[in-house]
UniProtKB/Swiss-Prot annotation:
Keywords: Amino-acid biosynthesis, Arginine biosynthesis, Cytoplasm, Lyase. It comes from Thermosynechococcus vestitus (strain NIES-2133 / IAM M-273 / BP-1). Coiled coil: none annotated. This is Argininosuccinate lyase. PROSITE patterns: FUMARATE_LYASES. GO terms for biological process: arginine biosynthetic process via ornithine; L-arginine biosynthetic process. It is found in: Cytoplasm. It comes from the Bacteria. Pathway: Amino-acid biosynthesis; L-arginine biosynthesis; L-arginine from L-ornithine and carbamoyl phosphate: step 3/3.
């Protein structure tokens, strides 16, 4: 049994092998582009009429037929199968069934090469807008959580070793800043997505007197591509998006890893609520952090799609090659993954975590994270910082050997170490003072954190 004929089949003497037809077809996934394909075709029909290539009546017939296909698809009445090959042929075939011979005029002065490029750009432009909205909601959620934890202290880490205490809000604000960079990257990428390839033809333009600026305007593009060859072969915009998507996933994955650690009994900084955790099939005591674990795992999918497209594109000569069909599943899955992870993480941060403030307070009281402040104290008294640093290092070593903390030293012991120490050393090394004192711009001091929260909310309002 042979595959059904395609618009290009008149060139061939034999029908395509059914297995090859299945292998070649993209309708199973590029049907996602149908709404954008219909909009692009309607704009193309209007342009054909404007330039006199078809009559206004023919254009109106095409536009109405395309709109009927849209309604059929939305109602679940148009479900093309493998015989269509791709979304473009599926639409063209159905259009001709609906409006007759005039349907065959739609593809005048157009190739599937510029058609699919237009569809993908329209799709990605829309998805970027959705992701930007999600990122702003992600920021709002983090800011709301941070607002309630300005004076909640949490150990800060370097090398996953206790380093200096922080305001929990300051820690959360770091992820707000990461999301801000994600937003800025996507907005820049959107500008490069928003260029129209429609009318570039297969690769060299067309002999018809088309108006590419008109179709670009109708579809909301800022301009048409300046080079037809570049227009049909460019996938930079997909790769750029995958780069930005990968960084979004990096940021979500880093926070996910921290939440997984914080939720463990070894840290016990947070408890997971029932609405955002799962259990074990065999261990009844378990409460598993599946959301952050899945986000951490799914990041690899997006990274893989980026790598796949880079490897695919590096060896392609100009202009269009069938390899480019592989961009869509990678792009679609990356979009779906990023959107799902942003939604899940936003819910998790809004209602899935309860920070254990007593445990956090005990944690920042039980280590040497205030050692830098002892060195700073001496430096403020005129002792060279490096000398102060070395002295405090020796003190920490002694305290570890004696199983006590810096706060446990008597004033006599402090002054025996250096005469510059006074009674105010105890206030200086209290965790809350340690945090409050770091009031330099961008620091974890409470005043700075409140200013940072206000500035972040102002940025959100500006959008």
């Amino acid at each position: 049994m042979s595959a059904p004929p395609q618009p290009w089949s008149q060139r061939f003497e034999q029908a395509l092998h059914p297995a090859i037809a299945r292998f070649n077809a993209s309708i199973g996934f590029d049907i996602r582009l149908i709404e954008y394909d219909l909009s692009g075709s309607q704009a193309h029909a209007r342009m054909l009429a404007k330039t006199g290539i078809i009559s206004p009546e023919e254009a109106e017939t095409l536009i109405q037929g395309l709109e009927q296909i849209r309604q059929e698809y939305r109602a679940g009445q148009f479900t093309p199968g493998i015989e269509a090959e791709d979304v473009h042929f599926a639409v063209e075939r159905r259009l001709t069934e609906l409006v007759g011979e005039v349907g065959k005029k739609l593809h005048t002065a157009r190739s599937r090469n510029d058609q699919v490029g237009t569809d993908v750009r329209l799709y990605l432009r829309s998805e970027i807008d959705h992701i930007l909205q999600q990122l702003r909601q992600w920021q709002r959620t983090l800011l709301d959580l941070a607002q309630s934890h300005v004076e909640t202290l949490i150990p800060g880490y370097t090398h996953l070793q206790r380093a200096q205490p922080l305001s929990l809000a300051h820690h959360l604000l770091a992820y707000v800043e990461m999301a801000q960079r994600d937003i800025e990257r996507l907005r820049q990428i959107r500008e490069r997505v928003n260029i129209s390839p429609l009318g570039a033809g297969a690769l060299a333009g067309t002999t018809f007197p088309i108006d590419r600026h008109y179709t670009a305007e109708l579809l909301g593009f800022r301009e048409p591509y300046r080079n037809s060859l570049d227009a049909v072969s460019d996938r930079d915009f997909v790769i750029e998006f995958l780069c930005a998507a990968s960084l979004i996933m990096v940021h979500l994955s880093r926070l996910s890893e921290e939440i997984i650690l914080w939720a463990s009994e070894e840290f016990a900084f947070v408890q997971l609520t029932d609405t955002c955790a799962t259990g074990s099939s065999i261990m009844p005591q378990k409460k598993n952090p599946d959301v952050p674990e899945l986000v951490r795992g799914k990041s690899g999918r997006v990274f893989g799609h980026l790598q796949a497209l880079l490897v695919m594109m590096k060896g392609l000569p100009l202009a269009y090659n069938k390899d480019l069909q592989e961009d869509k599943e990678a792009l679609f899955d990356a979009v779906d993954t990023v959107r799902a992870c942003l939604e899940a993480m936003t819910i998790l941060m809004a209602e899935g975590l309860v920070f254990q403030t007593q445990r956090l307070a005990a944690a920042v009281e039980s280590d040497f994270a205030n050692a830098t402040d002892v060195a700073d104290y001496l430096a403020s008294k005129g002792v060279p910082f490096r000398e102060a640093y070395n002295l405090v290092g020796q003190v920490v070593k002694t305290c570890v050997a004696q199983q006590k903390l810096l706060k446990d030293l008597t004033l006599e012991e402090w002054q025996a170490l250096h005469p510059a120490f006074g009674p105010d050393i105890y206030q200086r090394i209290a965790p809350r003072q340690v945090v409050a004192a770091r009031n330099s711009y961008g620091g974890t001091g409470f005043d700075q954190v409140r200013q940072a929260l206000a500035a972040a909310r102002d940025r959100l309002n500006d959008f």
